[in-house]
From Swiss-Prot:
Plays a role in the gravitropic response of the inflorescence stems and roots. May affect the synthesis of flavonols that have a role in regulating auxin transport. CDD domains: CYP93. The keyword Endoplasmic reticulum does not apply. Its EC number is 1.14.-.-. It is found in: Membrane. Keywords: Heme, Iron, Membrane, Metal-binding, Monooxygenase, Oxidoreductase, Transmembrane, Transmembrane helix. Pfam families: p450 (PF00067). GO terms for biological process: gravitropism; positive gravitropism. Its cofactor is heme. It comes from the Eukaryota. This is Cytochrome P450 705A22.
């Protein structure tokens, strides 16, 4: 009898425990948000899996391609859900244009962060900061001083020296008849330029600093997809006392903190005559300004550099790699680029940044590569308030996901959207400034758009333009086989090549005495 009572009690306890857990899961994860379909005319929603909704689509290897198939079947504006978290998916240039034109302020926040205290996209991050006083202050500081025209002019020699160093390295490979992995060479170039522009120094190869930085950037990019899921589910998980992927995120953050703290200490020990010309000096001046519009902290400074290295390094590297891949698969484009550069620059000196405004075809080639291969194929935002888009109601706090990859291949606004045609970006192929403005806002989104568009896009164009221009001007290139394999892969949330681009440089103008 005692055994029976004990058995019944155990069963009862297990039943109650399961019931409570089920109730909690339902309440926190599966309960519909306040703005339900019964009360509002939401966009159409494709069939979803029980409980988890459409989460499986975000877990695919090529998320942008999975979402492209979904939108081609069900429409350009869709309502998705991850458990009970609402998401609006946009896959049309016209819908994207309407949102950026009418809801720019409303979508100027990216939502909550994955882990507040992390330097990697935490609460101190300029990239993930909500649209408020801190973000406005940092945007103004970035546009006016950190990446403004004067700052770019002051740092021009830094970029020119590293482009020359890049060229010398390729020249050495050409003499040895060795192939190079374009992505790795571009990564070295970007790391050197960004370190010198931001901190006035390059990280040392000897003591492993360079490798540490590259490793942290790679690790952070690898975490980005996890961070996106952590952000989506954070509000629900917080109620249960759970922080998704916190250990991984804080592990990378702490390593960045050690590296950047060392940089800050060493910079303070520099003589005053060596200070005042790089981004770190501008940020330290703002940090010490008691009358500043917003009082930033050391964590804000560190987080800015984390944003810079994660946001600018791999995106520019992939742009260089994809652009060279397209050039190699289209030899007539290489010939036209070379003719333009030889005509403007000549054959007695190396291409310079000041030449770039006079090289429209080079610029068009880079833009076309960005159109077909945007580094960040998905652009996340958050609707702060409820609004109407395309005749449908969008509830407040709904995540917005713009599939820039699909928007920039929209056949309704792009002629032959799957073909590599740089000519579409030449001024002669467009009519008037209004068309150009609409093109930028409506169709071309590799750097986002509106208030949250990338403030470093002009700098990226200068570095990528100088690098691509130099490689075209100075070298012929050989590949294994007839064509470059253009198969895509995604690293974190960055669109990259599944097979790294390997080319063999051949000196075009020996002995390149002007290098």
């Amino acid at each position: 009898m005692e055994a029976v009572i004990s058995f019944d009690f155990q069963n009862c306890f297990i039943f109650i425990l399961i019931f409570l857990l089920t109730f909690l899961c339902f309440f926190f994860f599966f309960k519909k948000p306040k703005d339900s379909r019964v009360n509002f005319d939401l966009p159409p929603s494709p069939p979803s899996l029980p409980i988890i909704g459409h989460v499986h689509l975000l877990l695919s290897t090529l998320t942008h391609k999975s979402l492209q198939k979904l939108s081609s079947r069900y429409g350009p504006l869709l309502y998705l859900r991850i458990f009970n978290v609402p998401i609006i998916l946009v896959s049309s240039a016209s819908v994207a244009y309407e949102i950026f034109r009418t809801q720019d302020v409303n979508i100027s926040s990216r939502g909550v962060t994955a882990v507040d205290e992390s330097l990697v996209f935490g609460s101190s991050s300029f990239v993930t900061a909500p649209y408020g006083d801190y973000w406005k202050f940092m945007k103004k500081l970035t546009v006016m001083k950190l990446l403004g025209p004067q700052a770019q002019e002051q740092s021009r020699d830094i970029r020119a020296d590293d482009i020359k160093r890049f060229c010398r390295n390729l020249l050495d490979k050409a003499r040895k008849k060795e192939s190079v992995e374009i992505g790795k060479e571009a990564m070295n170039l970007m790391n050197n330029i960004l370190c010198k522009m931001s901190m006035g120094r390059s990280f040392s190869e000897e003591n492993g600093e360079t490798e540490k930085l590259r490793g942290l950037v790679t690790e952070s990019i690898g975490l980005m997809k996890k961070m996106f899921l952590a952000v989506l589910l954070r509000r629900q998980l917080q109620k249960l006392g759970i922080s998704l992927f916190k250990k991984d995120i804080m592990g990378v953050s702490n390593k960045f903190d050690v590296l950047l703290e060392k940089v800050l200490v060493e910079h303070r020990e520099k003589p005053e005559k060596d200070q005042g010309t790089v981004m770190l000096d501008v940020l330290l001046a703002a940090y010490g300004d008691e009358n500043a519009e917003y009082k930033i902290t050391k964590n804000h400074i560190k987080a800015f550099f984390v944003d810079l290295f994660i946001g600018a390094t791999d995106t520019s590297v992939q742009t260089i790699q994809w652009t060279m891949a397209e050039i190699m698969n289209n030899t007539h484009i290489l010939e036209r680029m070379r003719e333009e550069i030889d005509s403007v620059v000549g054959k007695s000196r190396l291409i310079q940044e000041t030449d770039l405004p006079n090289l429209p075809y080079l610029h068009a080639v880079i833009k076309e590569a960005l159109r077909l291969h945007p580094p960040g194929p998905l652009l996340p935002r958050e609707f702060q308030q409820g609004c109407k888009i395309g005749g449908f109601y969008i509830p407040e706090k709904t995540t917005l996901l713009i599939n820039a990859y699909v928007v920039m291949r929209d056949p309704n606004v792009w002629e032959d959207p799957e073909e590599f045609k740089p000519e579409r970006f030449l001024a002669s192929s467009r009519s008037g400034q209004e068309d150009e403005r609409r093109e930028q806002a409506l169709k071309f989104l590799p750097f986002g758009s509106g208030r949250r568009g990338c403030p470093g896009s002009n700098l990226a164009y200068m570095i990528v333009g100088s690098a691509i221009g130099m490689m075209v001007q100075c070298f012929d290139w050989r590949i294994e086989g007839e064509k470059v394999n253009m198969k895509e892969a995604v690293k974190g949330t960055i669109l990259t090549m599944a097979h790294p681009l390997k080319l063999t440089p051949v000196t075009r103008q020996p002995p390149l005495t002007w290098i």
